[in-house]
Amino acid sequence: MRIPVKSNDVKLPFQTIPLGLIFKEDVCVTISFYETEIISDFVQYTNRKNIHIRDNFDLVLRLLLSSSVWYLKYLKQINQKIKLAEDNLEKSIKNEELQALLQIEKCLVFFITSLKGNDVLFHRIKNLKAQREHFDQDLLEDVDIELSQAQDTANIYSNILTGMMDAYASVISNNMNNIMKQMTSISIILMIPTLIASLYGMNVPNGLEESKYGIWILLLVSVILSIFGVYLFKRRRWF
């Protein structure tokens, strides 16, 4: 089975690790790559509630139940991180907030994949014909409920996060289009006085070369055409 752990890696705050179980008569040895609080919590809870472990399958089922509870616990923390990133994105869209969402999405992918594997393990144990009569039916129901709830919660959060990232991607794309429109509009408006000055500066008769008001007329025409350009672009909502 795979169990959830909180990681010290900032880029991957939550991940899942395999938990191996070796049974030898009445002894069970757990093997894990990382130290996890799930096992110690499981032992303390079992002793505190005076829970009697019937057999090896009963132990595996209770570990599946405990891991599902921890999945739900970490999913609540992931949901808080999603809300925090959403609040930060509402204030300003920066790469840090988007990267935080990508990291959370990666954690959810690990959770969903691991929960599917645990669900397969649960149903294989549940469908063992030789052990059906010995299973605690209440325990089977509890494991089924908690495991299904953890899977549904992880899928819901993943769908919400995917929709949120798609929405922010659309917002960023729309903002880029608006900026490009504004830059294009400004460039066109700035070209108007430049074009008029270039035409006036040509060495050809234009009727204003002898007038002492020629430069002022050109300035006035440039201002009027520029204002008209601004008005036209505003009507088209390019500003």
Predicted regions and their residues:
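Hydrophobic alpha-helical transmembrane segments and their immediately adjacent juxtamembrane loops
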Residues: 148-239
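Peripheral, non-transmembrane regulatory/ligand-interaction domains of membrane transport proteins
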Residues: 1-134, 139-142, 146-153, 208, ...
